[in-house]
């Protein structure tokens, strides 16, 4: 007898903490690091922190180097990923017990398949990505020679954002 587990993607326990979709999108636009989760062929989870670009809509972009490793091998086996982006604030002291303390935080979880963009046909999209990456993470006073001569040495990933859930806590209650 086979039992199908319920799809729990996008569900949260405390509805009052649920962010509106536009709040989750704005949070994704402004944060710096995404933790990207994959599963290897033996069922082991693997999470890696990556810089990313999100400019609205339902696509999230990130990249790695060209060398095959754990991350790319996992994606070749299973293209479904989970991305987590968070910001942690202060711990608010609880009374009368320490376990009444609560953390200020915001987090967004994104589920969806990822597409690997590689090869000569991906150069325009890789150029777009690298331009956005430098604008987001670089400094305005930096200047470079035009072009990206090492562009073929990166792999670009495009995640289709199927399920997005954001939540936040003010730290004032559990």
Question: What name fits each language-model region?
Answer:
Residues 53-91:
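A short mixed-secondary-structure module that forms the rim of ligand-binding clefts
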Residues 7-35:
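Short, basic/aromatic recognition patches
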Residues 1-16, 88-174:
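Charged, gly/pro-rich active-site loop segments
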Residues 29-31, 44-46, 101, 151-152:
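Short solvent-exposed loop/turn micro-motifs enriched in small/polar/acidic residues
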Residues 31-66:
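Short beta-strand segments
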Residues 32, 48, 58, 77-84, ...:
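A generic structural signal for short beta-strands and their flanking turns/coil linkers
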Residues 28, 74-75, 133:
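A generic structural signal for nonpolar/aromatic side chains embedded in well-ordered alpha-helices
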């Amino acid at each position: 007898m086979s039992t199908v587990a319920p799809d729990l993607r996008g569900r949260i326990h405390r509805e009052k903490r649920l962010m509106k979709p536009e709040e989750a999108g704005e949070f994704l636009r402004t944060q710096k690091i995404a933790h990207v989760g994959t599963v290897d062929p033996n069922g082991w989870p693997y999470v890696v922190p990556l810089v990313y670009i999100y400019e609205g809509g339902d696509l999230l972009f990130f990249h790695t180097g060209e060398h095959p490793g754990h991350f790319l091998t996992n994606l070749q086996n299973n293209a479904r990923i989970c991305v987590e982006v968070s910001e942690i604030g202060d711990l608010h002291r609880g009374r009368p017990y320490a376990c009444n303390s609560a953390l200020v935080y915001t987090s967004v979880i994104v589920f969806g398949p990822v597409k690997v963009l590689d090869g000569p046909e991906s150069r325009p999209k890789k150029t777009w990505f690298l331009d956005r990456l430098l604008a987001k993470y670089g400094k305005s006073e930096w200047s470079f020679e035009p072009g990206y001569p090492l562009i073929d040495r990166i792999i670009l990933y495009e995640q289709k954002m199927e399920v997005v859930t954001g939540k936040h806590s003010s730290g004032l209650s559990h």
